[in-house]
A protein has these predicted regions:
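N-terminal secretory signal peptides that target proteins for export/translocation
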Residues: 1-13
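Bacterial N-terminal signal peptides
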Residues: 16-30
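The N-terminal extracellular segments of secreted preproproteins, especially immediately downstream
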Residues: 9, 17-19, 67, 151
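N-terminus-centered regions that define maturation/targeting leaders and the start
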Residues: 33-204
Protein backbone atom coordinates (compact mmCIF):
# COMPACT_ATOMS: atom_id res chain seq x y z
CA UNK A 1 0.00 0.00 0.00
CA UNK A 2 1.25 3.47 -0.88
CA UNK A 3 1.72 5.74 2.10
CA UNK A 4 0.08 9.21 2.00
CA UNK A 5 1.97 10.57 4.97
CA UNK A 6 4.50 12.25 2.75
CA UNK A 7 1.78 14.03 0.80
CA UNK A 8 0.60 16.15 3.72
CA UNK A 9 3.77 18.20 4.12
CA UNK A 10 3.83 18.91 0.40
CA UNK A 11 0.26 20.27 0.53
CA UNK A 12 0.76 22.37 3.65
CA UNK A 13 4.05 23.73 2.37
CA UNK A 14 2.18 25.64 -0.35
CA UNK A 15 0.16 27.65 2.19
CA UNK A 16 3.04 29.71 3.58
CA UNK A 17 4.15 30.51 0.02
CA UNK A 18 0.71 31.83 -0.85
CA UNK A 19 0.52 33.81 2.37
CA UNK A 20 3.93 35.31 1.81
CA UNK A 21 2.93 36.36 -1.70
CA UNK A 22 -0.30 37.90 -0.46
CA UNK A 23 1.44 39.74 2.36
CA UNK A 24 4.02 41.06 -0.06
CA UNK A 25 1.28 42.44 -2.30
CA UNK A 26 -0.55 44.03 0.63
CA UNK A 27 2.68 45.47 1.97
CA UNK A 28 3.41 46.98 -1.41
CA UNK A 29 0.01 48.62 -1.52
CA UNK A 30 0.44 50.01 1.98
CA UNK A 31 3.76 51.69 1.31
CA UNK A 32 3.15 52.77 -2.28
CA UNK A 33 2.81 56.56 -2.56
CA UNK A 34 -0.55 57.95 -3.58
CA UNK A 35 -0.29 59.38 -7.07
CA UNK A 36 -3.43 61.44 -6.52
CA UNK A 37 -2.16 62.97 -3.30
CA UNK A 38 1.20 63.71 -4.87
CA UNK A 39 -0.38 65.34 -7.89
CA UNK A 40 -2.53 67.54 -5.65
CA UNK A 41 0.40 68.92 -3.69
CA UNK A 42 3.17 68.89 -6.27
CA UNK A 43 4.04 72.40 -7.34
CA UNK A 44 1.59 74.00 -4.90
CA UNK A 45 2.85 77.28 -3.47
CA UNK A 46 1.29 78.47 -0.25
CA UNK A 47 1.11 82.23 -0.09
CA UNK A 48 -0.34 84.04 2.88
CA UNK A 49 -1.72 87.53 2.41
CA UNK A 50 -0.42 89.76 5.19
CA UNK A 51 -1.38 93.30 6.19
CA UNK A 52 0.79 95.39 8.52
CA UNK A 53 1.32 98.97 9.66
CA UNK A 54 4.39 100.70 11.00
CA UNK A 55 2.10 102.79 13.23
CA UNK A 56 0.75 99.96 15.36
CA UNK A 57 0.94 96.20 15.75
CA UNK A 58 -2.02 93.88 15.50
CA UNK A 59 -4.12 94.20 18.65
CA UNK A 60 -2.29 97.31 19.88
CA UNK A 61 -3.49 100.87 20.36
CA UNK A 62 -3.84 103.15 17.34
CA UNK A 63 -1.79 106.36 17.64
CA UNK A 64 -3.76 109.56 18.27
CA UNK A 65 -2.71 111.15 14.96
CA UNK A 66 -4.85 108.60 13.10
CA UNK A 67 -8.00 109.54 15.05
CA UNK A 68 -10.53 112.36 15.30
CA UNK A 69 -8.65 113.66 18.33
CA UNK A 70 -5.50 114.02 16.27
CA UNK A 71 -4.82 114.73 12.61
CA UNK A 72 -7.26 112.08 11.35
CA UNK A 73 -4.60 110.63 9.03
CA UNK A 74 -5.01 107.14 7.62
CA UNK A 75 -2.26 104.88 8.98
CA UNK A 76 0.47 103.62 6.68
CA UNK A 77 -0.39 100.15 5.43
CA UNK A 78 1.69 97.50 3.69
CA UNK A 79 0.76 94.10 2.31
CA UNK A 80 2.52 91.07 0.90
CA UNK A 81 1.74 87.55 -0.24
CA UNK A 82 -1.08 88.32 -2.67
CA UNK A 83 -1.96 84.99 -4.33
CA UNK A 84 -1.36 84.29 -7.99
CA UNK A 85 -4.38 85.36 -10.00
CA UNK A 86 -5.20 88.34 -7.81
CA UNK A 87 -6.47 91.10 -10.09
CA UNK A 88 -6.90 93.69 -7.36
CA UNK A 89 -7.50 94.30 -3.69
CA UNK A 90 -10.33 95.74 -1.63
CA UNK A 91 -9.94 97.36 1.79
CA UNK A 92 -12.63 97.86 4.42
CA UNK A 93 -12.02 99.57 7.77
CA UNK A 94 -14.78 99.26 10.36
CA UNK A 95 -15.62 99.31 14.06
CA UNK A 96 -17.97 96.57 15.31
CA UNK A 97 -18.18 98.07 18.81
CA UNK A 98 -20.36 101.11 18.10
CA UNK A 99 -21.58 102.92 20.03
CA UNK A 100 -20.53 101.16 23.24
CA UNK A 101 -18.32 98.04 23.31
CA UNK A 102 -20.25 96.88 26.37
CA UNK A 103 -23.47 96.91 24.33
CA UNK A 104 -22.61 97.16 20.61
CA UNK A 105 -25.53 97.90 18.32
CA UNK A 106 -23.91 98.43 14.94
CA UNK A 107 -20.70 98.33 12.91
CA UNK A 108 -19.45 101.78 11.94
CA UNK A 109 -17.62 101.97 8.60
CA UNK A 110 -14.53 104.20 8.40
CA UNK A 111 -13.05 103.55 4.95
CA UNK A 112 -13.91 101.67 1.76
CA UNK A 113 -11.31 101.24 -1.00
CA UNK A 114 -11.33 98.91 -4.02
CA UNK A 115 -9.37 98.04 -7.19
CA UNK A 116 -6.08 98.52 -5.36
CA UNK A 117 -3.30 97.00 -7.47
CA UNK A 118 -1.81 94.05 -5.61
CA UNK A 119 1.63 95.05 -6.86
CA UNK A 120 1.40 98.49 -5.23
CA UNK A 121 2.36 96.88 -1.93
CA UNK A 122 1.49 99.78 0.36
CA UNK A 123 -0.47 102.95 1.12
CA UNK A 124 1.31 105.94 2.61
CA UNK A 125 0.15 107.60 5.81
CA UNK A 126 -2.61 110.14 5.24
CA UNK A 127 -2.84 109.30 1.56
CA UNK A 128 -5.26 111.52 -0.39
CA UNK A 129 -7.60 110.21 -3.08
CA UNK A 130 -5.59 111.76 -5.88
CA UNK A 131 -2.47 110.01 -4.61
CA UNK A 132 -3.96 106.53 -4.54
CA UNK A 133 -2.52 104.07 -7.10
CA UNK A 134 -3.92 104.55 -10.60
CA UNK A 135 -7.28 102.87 -11.09
CA UNK A 136 -8.11 102.68 -7.38
CA UNK A 137 -11.69 103.49 -6.40
CA UNK A 138 -13.23 104.61 -3.12
CA UNK A 139 -16.60 103.95 -1.54
CA UNK A 140 -18.71 105.65 1.10
CA UNK A 141 -18.09 105.40 4.82
CA UNK A 142 -20.81 105.91 7.41
CA UNK A 143 -20.22 109.67 7.39
CA UNK A 144 -21.20 109.45 3.70
CA UNK A 145 -17.68 110.50 2.75
CA UNK A 146 -15.16 108.79 0.50
CA UNK A 147 -12.04 109.64 2.50
CA UNK A 148 -10.70 107.85 5.55
CA UNK A 149 -12.42 108.70 8.82
CA UNK A 150 -10.37 107.92 11.91
CA UNK A 151 -11.45 106.32 15.18
CA UNK A 152 -13.74 108.53 17.24
CA UNK A 153 -15.42 106.26 19.80
CA UNK A 154 -18.09 107.95 21.95
CA UNK A 155 -17.77 105.41 24.78
CA UNK A 156 -14.97 103.11 25.87
CA UNK A 157 -12.20 101.40 23.90
CA UNK A 158 -13.24 100.22 20.46
CA UNK A 159 -11.66 97.77 18.02
CA UNK A 160 -10.90 98.86 14.46
CA UNK A 161 -10.51 96.20 11.79
CA UNK A 162 -8.53 96.83 8.61
CA UNK A 163 -9.65 94.04 6.28
CA UNK A 164 -7.87 93.41 2.99
CA UNK A 165 -9.28 91.12 0.29
CA UNK A 166 -7.41 89.74 -2.73
CA UNK A 167 -9.88 89.42 -5.62
CA UNK A 168 -9.88 87.54 -8.90
CA UNK A 169 -11.87 90.29 -10.62
CA UNK A 170 -11.88 94.03 -11.16
CA UNK A 171 -14.84 96.01 -9.90
CA UNK A 172 -16.56 98.76 -11.92
CA UNK A 173 -14.68 102.05 -12.16
CA UNK A 174 -16.28 105.27 -10.91
CA UNK A 175 -18.43 103.40 -8.41
CA UNK A 176 -18.92 104.62 -4.83
CA UNK A 177 -20.21 101.54 -3.00
CA UNK A 178 -21.12 101.26 0.64
CA UNK A 179 -19.45 98.52 2.64
CA UNK A 180 -22.51 96.30 2.19
CA UNK A 181 -22.54 96.83 -1.57
CA UNK A 182 -18.84 96.08 -1.82
CA UNK A 183 -19.17 92.91 0.25
CA UNK A 184 -21.97 91.74 -2.05
CA UNK A 185 -19.90 92.49 -5.16
CA UNK A 186 -16.86 90.51 -3.98
CA UNK A 187 -18.77 87.38 -2.99
CA UNK A 188 -17.28 84.41 -4.82
CA UNK A 189 -14.22 86.41 -5.89
CA UNK A 190 -12.08 86.42 -2.73
CA UNK A 191 -8.80 84.53 -3.16
CA UNK A 192 -7.31 85.49 0.19
CA UNK A 193 -7.99 87.79 3.13
CA UNK A 194 -5.80 89.56 5.69
CA UNK A 195 -6.75 91.49 8.78
CA UNK A 196 -5.12 94.06 11.03
CA UNK A 197 -6.86 95.19 14.22
CA UNK A 198 -6.09 98.19 16.39
CA UNK A 199 -7.88 99.75 19.34
CA UNK A 200 -8.61 103.27 20.49
CA UNK A 201 -10.21 105.05 23.45
CA UNK A 202 -10.68 108.79 23.57
CA UNK A 203 -8.29 110.63 25.82
CA UNK A 204 -10.97 113.06 26.96
Amino acid sequence: MRSTVGQVPRRTSRIPVCLVSLLAILDGLAVAPSVTAASQTEGAVEMTLMLTSTSFENGAGIPRRHTCEGEDLSPPLAWSGAPEGAVGLALIVDDPDAPDPAAPKMTWVHWVVYNLPAAAGSLAEGIAFQDLPAGTGVGLNDWQRTEYGGPCPPIGRHRYFFKLYALDTRLPDGWQPTKAQLETAIQGHVLAQAELMGTYKKER
